Amino acid sequence: MLERMQEALQRLRKERPVILNTTNYVSMDFLANCFLAIGASPIMSVSDLELEELIELSSAVYINIGTLDHLFIQRAYRTVDLAVRQNKPVIFDPVAAGATKIRTEVSHHLLAHATIVRGNASEILSFGDVTMKTRGVDSTHSTQDAKDVATALAKECLCGCAIAVSGAIDFITDGQRHTTVELGDPFMSYVVGMGCSLTGVFAAFRSVIDDSFEATKLGIEYFTLCGMLARERCEGPGLFKAYLLDELYASDFSRMRQYYDR
């Protein structure tokens, strides 16, 4: 699978696909840098006036509801409608779904047309139980708790989507295929925007791989392997963030193999 990952990255860096981001303001800078490091070309637009034209230019669309307000909701809804009309993959991160009524409602609306969805266990569980409350962006459940809901959601999605449940162990399903990924490092939970950027990596991989399940699996593995390599070089989360960008850019598969093959 490392060879397939390497092929996807080569395509990314050759084609430099444009990824349109309707995303939160907290992690926008780090997210854009992650895109650049792996070879994608991010557009971080906040204007409705250029939305349709930018979607035409884009190979994939990424929506992240981290900083939610009424203007963002309108733009996110219009983004997904235009993307579906133009047959562009929609990658969705339902940040803090289940924490508030509005986040849960917006997430349900966007989920229906998503190509890939990534959330923590509590966020994914909120799609199966509208009465369940989460604790903001932090998960109060394990990946194992969300497997059945994730599988059911993937089967129900209109676009045949892949669902990724992030945690100490990641779970990926498209309703038919299932896999787990046990990679990464605890430092990843100490950097704001790490999950947002992981979902962005899915968007980049999906722009060059038509199979959403495979794109999601490769994206998780690449991002978490780079996290493990970054951890070798630092003792705290501040430098970890910088070294992660370096590793995303370097693509040192010889060093990755020690973790991938163990």
UniProtKB/Swiss-Prot annotation:
Its EC number is 2.7.1.50. Its cofactor is Mg(2+). ATP binds at R118, S166. Pathway: Cofactor biosynthesis; thiamine diphosphate biosynthesis; 4-methyl-5-(2-phosphoethyl)-thiazole from 5-(2-hydroxyethyl)-4-methylthiazole: step 1/1. It is an enzyme of class 2 (transferase). The keyword Iron-sulfur does not apply. GO terms for molecular function: ATP binding; hydroxyethylthiazole kinase activity; magnesium ion binding. SUPFAM superfamilies: Ribokinase-like. CDD domains: THZ_kinase (cd01170). GO terms for biological process: thiamine biosynthetic process; thiamine diphosphate biosynthetic process. Keywords: ATP-binding, Kinase, Magnesium, Metal-binding, Nucleotide-binding, Thiamine biosynthesis, Transferase. Transmembrane segments: none annotated. It holds the Pfam family HK. Catalyzes the phosphorylation of the hydroxyl group of 4-methyl-5-beta-hydroxyethylthiazole (THZ). This is Hydroxyethylthiazole kinase. The lineage of its organism: Bacteria, Pseudomonadati, Chlamydiota, Chlamydiia, Chlamydiales. The gene is thiM.
